[in-house]
Each structure stands twice: as structure tokens, then as C-alpha cells.
Amino acid sequence: MDFDDHDDGDEEMPPMPVSSSYETPPQHGLAGGGMAPKPPGEIGSHVKGPSCGGGRYRECLKNHAVGIGGHAVDGCGEFMAAGEEGTIDALRCAACNCHRNFHRKESESLAGEGSPFSPAAVVPYGATPHHQFSPYYRTPAGYLHHHQHHMAAAAAAAAAAAGGHPQRPLALPSTSHSGRDDGDDLSGMVGPMSAVGPLSGMSLGAGPSGSGSGKKRFRTKFTQEQKDKMLAFAERVGWRIQKHDEAAVQQFCDEVGVKRHVLKVWMHNNKHTLGKKLP
């Protein structure tokens, strides 16, 4: 008696899978041969009874997260009939309480016959099956992973391989250049100057390679007369250029022959050295 086509009032038959990945074409000419396992995405839903077709039913493939658009299985590894053969309970798994059709069927077929599934559905040995209808999949160990993370990692690895060379590291300021001229506008960066604000690192750099271009920057050279005049002017304005001193600063720059920003940098660099030497 065939029990797959009848429904019991006390037993609610679970809905048949709607995904095309659960369907498998019927097999013809089954005979006792080598065991040919099917991909995890296909089950023998066409079998009409416990004695039809033979074979064993392996892990349960029922998607318990279809309501939220995901994919999660219960971890049942093999179908175990809940009743004796010939009863309605024989089609229900005693471990996961799912219908037998949700379990992957491992049928017996001849190796020379045509494969009942397409070559694209074959999962290589050791590879984890990725279900196309859901961004989530579960590894054989039972842990839920997000498929997009692995896709992004694979895309990054492919881009790195296609590039042929790794990304160049950022150029760091050179620390080997220590022979500065005491007479230029970038001198005086010694002693207490290492503890001042970020203006020196932002506007002055750290040497010829501080900008990363490798080109040596132009440095202004001062005569001793210019240094003396700038020192006297800096003491007069208090080593700081304020708004009410703009006219005097511009007049001094025209007389000495230096630019305003050069004078400002020189005052900043020598404020903690020459300014503290005075009584």
C-alpha cells in the first residue's frame, strides 16, 4: 500500500520544497552498483514509498529559515524512521520530525549510466556548497556564515592577484638628515623645539624627503645682519606677530628683504632657543 499519496488527519504532511534545487529528475534503470552520492542540494522527492527505488536517506535539507529569507538546517545527519515499515510513521524522521523527502537520498546506480544531475550541480570534494537562493549557508560543522563576506574576500584576493604587485607603502619622513644650516629659515629645530605644537611638522616637514617626492626643498639663507635685525624685531614684538603689528611687520620685511611668512617661520623656530638665551 502506498502511503505517500494519502494524508492522515492527525499527521500534517509538510509542504513539498518549492525551490528548484530540491528537485531531481527521475532515475531509470536503477541496479545494484556503486554508491553514487548526490549533491546536498538535491533529494529524492519522487520516491513513492519506503520500498521504491532503494537507497538510504542521509542528512536533512529542510530550510528552517525560509520565512526570513535565510537558510538553516537542523543538523540531522541521517533519516531514522519513526515507525515500522508500512505505517505512516515510517515516512517521518524520529530525530528531526521531518518528512523523509526532506532528506538527501543516496541511491544505487550504475556508474556507466547517465548522471541524473547536471555537472554544474556537482560540488567538488572538500568544497562547501553555497546555495544560490540565500546569502547564508551552513557548513558541515553546523555554523551559520554569511556568503557575502566570503565573496568580498575572494574578490579582493582576485584583484590583488590581477594587479601583479602589492600596494606601495606610504613614504615616511627621513630621519637620517641632521646636517641643517643654522642660517636658514628652517633651522633651530633642536632642544625644546621638539615639544612645541604641530605647526613645525605641518608646514616645515622633516627633511628633503618629508614630502615623499624626494626633491630637495629650497631653503632661505640669511646674512648675519639679517639675523641680528630679525632678532631685535622679534624681541620688540614679543616673538609673536599680532594683528596690530601688521603694518610694522610689513615695513620691517621691506627694509630687511625677507618675506612675511619667512620671518614668521624664523621667529617660531628660534623662539625657544634665541629667546631664552636673553637675560
UniProtKB/Swiss-Prot annotation:
Region (Disordered): 1-47, 157-191
Marked site positions, Required for DNA-binding: M267
One of the GO BP terms on file: regulation of developmental process
Zinc fingers (ZF-HD dimerization-type) by residue: 57-106
Chief place where the protein resides: nucleus
Feature: compositional bias, Acidic residues: 1-13
Residue ranges: DNA binding: 215-278
Keywords, sorted A to Z: DNA-binding, Homeobox, Metal-binding, Nucleus, Transcription, Transcription regulation, Zinc, Zinc-finger
One Pfam match: ZF-HD_dimer
Keyword Zinc-finger: yes
Localization (cell): Nucleus
Gene3D superfamilies tied to this protein: Homeodomain-like
GO MF annotations in UniProt: DNA-binding transcription factor activity; transcription cis-regulatory region binding; zinc ion binding
Cellular compartments per GO CC: nucleus
Protein purpose: Putative transcription factor.
Domain notes: The homeodomain differs form the typical one by having namely 4 instead of 3 extra amino acids inserted in the loop between helix 1 and helix 2.
UniProt subunit comment: Homo- and heterodimer with other ZFHD proteins.
The protein's name in its UniProt record: Zinc-finger homeodomain protein 1
Protein species of origin: Oryza sativa subsp. indica (Rice)
